[in-house]
């Protein structure tokens, strides 16, 4: 089987078919405690946005609002120009836990919710994630990375226009994690869906995203466009500068946002940076 890295390098991005998102002045409360307030964010169809921030800052809460798993307490959320509310058939969420059914074989896990006549579609998507030969096996026989591939196939078999990723790779070893990042990026380029990723890993955010958004204490503190060419090389000086600048901003709340802008100025393909709390782009 051809390596993911080789396949990834050869892919060209298709025309986006993803969901457009617009969040304005969003507020979320639990009792009297506000966990999100003043969130303003727009995500273009087919855009890949990564959300970073410390634990408890509100990243996953925002993801649940976008997914329709929880209601918004103030402001508005629109999908493709229409007010969003509740679960949508064209959106799927992938979690850190693959949540496979142990009593169903791999192909049956991918085909959950599909008519029996669509099993060929499930087999096709399983092949896209590199596991066609494991279709008849039980989930218990798979590695952690393979289980996440099955979970990804189960999400993509429904042909979502919006894929929400809530720390899906956090429990994987470093090499498997990079392999999965390449797979996700390649499928995103090929299929054109909108992707929103919540992650604690700044390197992962820089590797995958068109934009990296930092949330601090329920507010957007940084929105940085990543204009590095794809596929991205972690050892490249421009990549390292961006990763370090964003990580410093995450870890040192009073750090100067201009540090991120300065790092961006060294990238070979210059373009304007958007670093503000008003021009937001959020993600899982």
Curated annotation (Swiss-Prot):
PROSITE patterns per UniProt: ABC_TRANSPORTER_1, ABC_TRANSPORTER_2, SSUB
SMART domains assigned: AAA
Subcellular localization, as worded in the UniProt entry: Cell inner membrane
Reaction equation(s) it catalyzes: ATP + H2O + aliphatic sulfonate-[sulfonate-binding protein]Side 1 = ADP + phosphate + aliphatic sulfonateSide 2 + [sulfonate-binding protein]Side 1
UniProt keyword annotation of Transport present: yes
Pfam family, one: ABC_tran
Gene Ontology cellular-component terms listed: plasma membrane
Top-tier EC class: translocase
Residue span(s) of domain ABC transporter: 21-242
Recorded GO MF terms: ATP binding; ATP hydrolysis activity
Positions annotated to bind ATP: 53-60
EC number(s) per entry: 7.6.2.14
Record bears the keyword Transferase: no
Keywords: ATP-binding, Cell inner membrane, Cell membrane, Membrane, Nucleotide-binding, Translocase, Transport
Membrane topology: Peripheral membrane protein
Family: Belongs to the ABC transporter superfamily. Aliphatic sulfonates importer (TC 3.A.1.17.2) family.
Oligomeric and partner information: The complex is composed of two ATP-binding proteins (SsuB), two transmembrane proteins (SsuC) and a solute-binding protein (SsuA).
Cross-referenced PANTHER family: ALIPHATIC SULFONATES IMPORT ATP-BINDING PROTEIN SSUB, TAURINE IMPORT ATP-BINDING PROTEIN-RELATED
Cited function: Part of the ABC transporter complex SsuABC involved in aliphatic sulfonates import. Responsible for energy coupling to the transport system.
The protein, known as: Aliphatic sulfonates import ATP-binding protein SsuB
């Amino acid at each position: 089987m051809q390596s993911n890295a080789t396949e990834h390098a050869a892919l060209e991005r298709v025309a986006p078919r993803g969901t457009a998102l617009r969040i304005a002045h969003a507020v979320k409360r639990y009792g009297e405690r506000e966990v999100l307030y003043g969130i303003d964010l727009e995500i273009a169809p087919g855009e890949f946005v990564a959300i970073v921030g410390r634990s408890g800052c509100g990243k996953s809460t925002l993801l649940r609002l976008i997914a329709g798993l929880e209601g918004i307490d103030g402001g508005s959320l629109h999908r493709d120009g229409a007010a969003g509310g509740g679960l949508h058939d064209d959106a799927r969420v992938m979690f850190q836990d693959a949540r496979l059914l142990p009593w169903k074989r791999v192909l049956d896990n991918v085909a959950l919710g599909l008519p029996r006549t669509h099993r060929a579609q499930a087999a096709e998507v399983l092949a896209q994630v590199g596991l066609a030969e494991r279709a008849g096996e039980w989930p218990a026989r798979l590695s952690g990375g393979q289980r996440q591939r099955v979970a990804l196939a189960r999400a993509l078999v429904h042909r979502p226009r919006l894929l929400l990723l809530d720390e899906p790779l956090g429990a994987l070893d470093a090499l498997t994690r990079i392999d999965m990042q390449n797979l996700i990026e390649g499928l995103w380029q090929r299929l054109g869906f909108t992707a929103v990723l919540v992650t604690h890993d700044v390197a992962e955010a820089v590797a995958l995203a068109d934009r990296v958004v930092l949330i601090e204490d329920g507010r957007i503190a940084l929105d940085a466009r990543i204009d590095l060419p794809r596929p991205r090389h972690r050892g490249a000086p421009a990549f390292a500068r961006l990763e370090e600048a964003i990580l410093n901003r995450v870890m040192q709340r009073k750090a100067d946002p201009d540090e991120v802008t300065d790092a961006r100025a060294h990238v070979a393909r210059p373009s304007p940076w958007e670093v503000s709390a008003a021009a937001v782009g959020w993600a899982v």
